[in-house]
Design a protein with these regions (language model features):
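C-terminal, charged and often intrinsically disordered regions of DNA end-processing helicases
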Residues: 1-36, 108, 265, 273-275, ...
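Mg2+/Mn2+-dependent nuclease catalytic core
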Residues: 112-115, 119-215
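A non-catalytic, helix-rich entry segment at domain boundaries
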Residues: 45-117, 285-286, 293, 297-298
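Short acidic (Asp/Glu) and glycine-rich catalytic loops that position anionic groups and cofactors
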Residues: 19-26, 43-46, 75-76, 148-152, ...
Length: 323
C-alpha cells in the first residue's frame, strides 16, 4: 500500500488503475522521452530566471539559462542516448528555445517577483497524505495568492480547460490548510501555443476537489485490498507507454504480479536493514524484539538477489514495451 499520494498519481489512477499499478506498484519505469526532457529543462530555466535581477530577465538570458540547465540535465543516466545525432539534439534545443520565446510573449517576468518557486506542498486530508511540488506561487496586485503551473504542451480549448486544474485545486486546498489563506486564482501557462488559462478559486470548488480526491483515495485502498486494478480503455490509450503489456490490447500480456510481490518484499527488507542500522550493537536488542533474530548480512544478501531478479524481470518486460 502506498503511503503518500501526489496530484499526478491521483489523476493517473482516475484515468486508468492498471496504468497506476504498472507505474507505482510494479514499478515498471517509463523511459524519459525527448518531450519530458524538454519540459524538465524549460521548467528549470524558468525557475532560474527569477534568480536574476528584474532588468536582466530578457530572452537572451533565458536562452542561456536553458542551455545551462540542459548541460546539467543531459549528464543524468536517464537522458543517456536520448538523441541519435547532434542534429536531432540541436532541433530539440531550438524547439525548447521557441517555447521560452512564447513565454516571454505572454508574461512579463520583469514586472513581478514570485512569492515562491518549486515549493513543496504537503498535508493530510483525513487518512490521506498528499504531497507534491508546485511550480510557482505569486501575490497579485490585490495581495492575493495565485498558484501558477507551466505546461510545455498545447492548451486545450477553453471550454475543456477545467479538468486540467485538478492538481492546482489540490495544491490550493493544501496551501489553504497550511497557511490559513485561500488562493484566489489558479493559472496554467501553456507554452506550445502561448496561452494562459485561469480559474477563480472558491470555497465550494475546494470542498468539491476534497470530496473528489478522497473518493479516488478510497478507490485506491479498495484496489489494494482486492488486488484489482482494472484497465480503463479511453482516448489516451494510444499514448500510453504500457499499452503493449495491457491485457485490454494484448491477450498474452505478461503477469506483473510477481514484480509487485518482489517490490513489496524489497521494501520490507530495506526497512528491516534501516532499523538494524540504528543500533551500534545488535546485542543491545531485547530478546523479544522482532529484530533480534535478524542478521543484517543475510538481509543485505537477500536484498541484492531480489533486486537482481526484479531487474531481470523488468528488462524482459521492457523488451516487450520497446517492440
Amino acid at each position: 500500500m502506498i503511503k503518500n499520494l501526489s496530484p499526478s498519481r491521483a489523476s493517473q489512477f482516475k484515468t486508468c488503475p492498471k496504468q497506476f499499478k504498472f507505474a507505482n506498484i510494479d514499478k515498471i519505469k517509463e523511459p524519459t522521452t525527448e518531450v519530458q526532457a524538454k519540459g524538465t529543462t524549460v521548467h528549470q530555466a524558468l525557475e532560474n530566471l527569477f534568480d536574476l535581477k528584474p532588468d536582466e530577465r530578457n530572452t537572451e538570458k533565458l536562452h542561456n539559462l536553458f542551455r545551462e540547465a540542459w548541460t546539467k540535465v543531459r549528464g543524468n543516466d536517464e537522458h543517456h542516448n536520448l538523441f541519435s545525432s547532434v542534429e536531432e539534439e540541436r532541433e530539440w534545443g531550438l524547439d525548447g528555445l521557441k517555447l521560452l520565446n512564447n513565454y516571454m510573449s505572454i508574461e512579463d517576468p520583469t514586472s513581478f517577483e514570485p512569492l515562491e518557486r518549486e515549493r513543496w506542498v504537503r498535508g493530510s486530508i483525513e487518512d490521506l497524505n498528499l504531497r507534491g511540488i508546485l511550480d510557482r506561487m505569486d501575490r497579485n496586485n490585490k495581495g492575493e495568492l495565485v498558484i501558477v503551473d507551466y505546461k510545455s504542451g498545447k492548451a486545450p480549448l477553453a471550454k475543456y480547460k477545467e479538468p486540467r486544474f485538478f492538481a492546482l485545486k489540490l495544491y490550493a486546498l493544501l496551501i489553504q490548510k497550511e497557511l490559513g489563506e485561500m488562493p484566489s486564482e489558479l493559472k496554467l501557462i501553456y507554452l506550445k501555443n502561448s496561452t494562459i488559462h485561469t480559474l477563480k478559486v472558491t470555497q465550494d470548488s475546494l470542498d468539491q476537489v476534497k470530496i473528489e480526491v478522497l473518493e479516488i483515495w478510497n478507490n485506491i485502498k479498495k484496489a489494494f485490498e482486492t488486488n484489482e486494478f482494472p484497465a480503463t480503455k479511453n482516448t489516451l490509450c494510444d499514448w500510453c507507454y504500457y499499452k503493449p503489456i495491457c491485457p485490454v490490447f494484448n491477450e498474452n500480456a505478461p503477469d506483473t504480479e510477481k514484480l509487485k510481490e518482489i517490490n513489496e518484499e524489497l521494501i520490507d527488507i530495506k526497512e528491516q536493514i534501516e532499523a538494524l542500522d540504528m543500533f551500534e550493537n545488535i546485542d543491545e536488542l531485547p530478546d523479544n524484539s522482532e529484530l533480534a533474530s535478524l542478521n543484517i548480512n543475510e538481509l543485505e544478501e537477500k536484498y541484492q538477489k531480489l533486486d537482481i531478479e526484479r531487474a531481470e524481470m523488468e528488462d524482459s518486460i521492457q523488451k516487450l514495451l520497446r517492440e
